[in-house]
């Protein structure tokens, strides 16, 4: 896959290493020894594990919701500062109302590694994702303003296989009712400075910051 996409466009060497901002306190993500050292003033994995193991004792049995699942993974301090507010802003729900599986794969590392992904290859297309999209669609017929669900038979006849990327409940004609969805609103702001926040990705994890 890496060779294929590089045959279309050139990639830079961007590596995703997010930072969390909790009321002006800065923490590395994913949760790793840099996070734990900043949170508790410690330096070894043994110290971090001891604190987390002590804090997770408040959870008895199998976690029943996202809050319990998060605490069972990273303890109460990190949950309160870096998980709870950010997650509730994302989902528009209290963490106690969200299922545990949402956060079961929360990465926790006992090394000083700020790399969010473990993938061998990482990068962003130079010139943006539009460049690679244009290359992928070269020679393809593109029709805009179409509604697949309005005439399924017509569009099904155009190809041996159809990949539908719309809402799954509408695809099945809402046979089980409408699903609840959360979406994103992107806002662009151009600032007259060389470097505004010091990192490509910063998560504002307190509940009061509206993003």
Where are these regions (language model features)?
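Short secondary-structure boundary micro-motifs
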Residues: 2-4, 73-74, 126, 185-186, ...
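Active-site/ligand-binding neighborhood in enzyme catalytic cores
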Residues: 20-161, 165-172
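Short, solvent-exposed secondary-structure boundary motifs
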Residues: 8-11, 95-98, 125, 132, ...
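Mid-domain catalytic core of redox enzymes
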Residues: 148-211
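A short alpha-helix-loop-beta-strand transition element characteristic
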Residues: 2-23, 78-81
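Residue-level signal for pocket-adjacent positions within structured domains
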Residues: 9, 15, 24, 93, ...
């Amino acid at each position: 896959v890496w060779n294929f996409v590089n045959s279309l466009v050139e990639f830079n060497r961007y590596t995703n290493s997010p930072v969390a901002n909790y009321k002006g306190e800065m923490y590395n993500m994913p949760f790793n020894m840099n996070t734990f050292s900043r949170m508790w003033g410690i330096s070894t994995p043994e110290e971090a594990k001891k604190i987390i193991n002590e804090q997770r004792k408040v959870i008895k049995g199998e976690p029943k919701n996202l809050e319990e699942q998060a605490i069972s993974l990273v303890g109460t301090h990190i949950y309160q500062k870096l998980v709870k507010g950010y997650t509730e802003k994302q989902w528009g729900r209290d963490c106690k109302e969200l299922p545990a599986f949402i956060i079961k794969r929360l990465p926790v590392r006992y090394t000083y590694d700020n790399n969010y992904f473990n993938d061998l290859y990482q990068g962003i297309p130079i010139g943006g994702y539009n460049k690679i999209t244009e290359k992928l669609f070269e020679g393809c017929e593109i029709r805009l303003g179409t509604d697949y669900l309005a005439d399924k038979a017509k569009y099904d006849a155009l190809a041996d296989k159809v990949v539908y990327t719309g809402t799954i409940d509408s695809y099945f004609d809402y046979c089980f009712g409408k699903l609840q969805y959360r979406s994103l609103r992107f806002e662009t702001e151009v600032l007259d400075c060389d470097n505004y926040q010091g990192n490509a990705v910063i998560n504002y994890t307190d509940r009061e910051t509206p993003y």
